[in-house]
Amino acid sequence: MKKALITGITGQDGSYLAEFLLEKGYQVHGIKRRSSSFNTSRIDHIYQDPHEVNPHFFLHYGDLTDTSNLIRLVKEIQPDEIYNLGAQSHVAVSFESPEYTADVDAMGTLRLLEAVRINGLEHKTRFYQASTSELYGLVQEIPQRETTPFYPRSPYAVAKMYAYWITVNYRESYGMYACNGILFNHESPRRGETFVTRKITRAIANIALGLEDCLYLGNMDSLRDWGHAKDYVRMQWMMLQQDQPEDFVIATGKQITVREFVRMSAKEAGIEIEFSGKGIDEIATISAISDEYATSAKVGDIIVRVDPRYFRPAEVETLLGDPSKAKEKLGWVPEITVEEMCAEMVAGDLQQAKQHALLKANGFDVSITLES
């Protein structure tokens, strides 16, 4: 039985990857950080009590900032595959906490690679590094492919660039099977609420049911290549099953604006909207309502505004990946469209919003946490 070690297992990608590997018959080990509150909601459904007979899923406390912990865990587990998905992954937060972002995202990758090397597992353990399309930043060509020069535009992207190149360096220096997946934006109902797609679908659901008045966004002209996390974790696994390690772009090859994702999300909730104004004065107004979900929304309501607080210090205007290498060499193609992904996300957030609305209607004090 193959053994896999996943950092970031409590996140969106980690939870989907754990499901995928368990279905493949793997023994899955995940590293989770100690928290004062429960942070395992995405993996509760696959959790196995260690007292059960022959469990295949194990959680370990650890942190990418703790060298000795990583060395010990790699020694104890002796993994066949490591998927380094753990990171401080929010671009805006990286401007507020640049040192922490560098420590986790850059040095954390080095610590994990060193844990493999120090334990003498260079030729046993295969290593996958979750890289990012943010490396391209101020894009040098469209679309972006494996050979496109990097131009990072945030502390997060700079940290991830170090992680990318140290992974390449360990592959070339020590003969490790180590590779980078350059992941373009990928979403799902498990996406964190502060990331723009989930922020949008959650707010639209809340607005439809009268739990929120208005959604505030930054640059709505931003173009992104959005795929589904399920498709992307499948590609991550495929990358470690090849004869030779290579780096791959993981993307759909299609892009839409943030504005269009808002429109798409609203339509899934039965709300038609019209945009007007420009720049910080742009708004979206409800023009029609066509679904029973939107019980509290009214035609004429302004439900989207621009807030300059959400502009990045250095903006990344467009990201569009070219996944042709993945298709040609691995046979990978994304199976879930952005429209299907959006519908799934809105449906999930509507279900949650309906529960909150029901509690509120029956006299319970329900507060909806909104991004500041």
UniProtKB/Swiss-Prot annotation:
Pathway: Bacterial outer membrane biogenesis; LPS O-antigen biosynthesis; Nucleotide-sugar biosynthesis; GDP-L-fucose biosynthesis via de novo pathway; GDP-L-fucose from GDP-alpha-D-mannose: step 1/2. Catalyzes the conversion of GDP-D-mannose to GDP-4-dehydro-6-deoxy-D-mannose. InterPro entries: GDP_Man_deHydtase, NAD(P)-bd_dom, NAD(P)-bd_dom_sf. It catalyses: GDP-alpha-D-mannose = GDP-4-dehydro-alpha-D-rhamnose + H2O. Its cofactor is NADP(+). Belongs to the NAD(P)-dependent epimerase/dehydratase family. GDP-mannose 4,6-dehydratase subfamily. The active site is at T132, E134 (nucleophile), Y156 (nucleophile). One of its GO terms (molecular function) is NADP+ binding. GO terms for biological process: 'de novo' GDP-L-fucose biosynthetic process; O antigen biosynthetic process. This is GDP-mannose 4,6-dehydratase. NADP(+) binds at residues 8-13, 63-64, 85-89, 100, 160, 186, 191. It comes from the Bacteria. Its EC number is 4.2.1.47. Keywords: Lipopolysaccharide biosynthesis, Lyase, NADP.
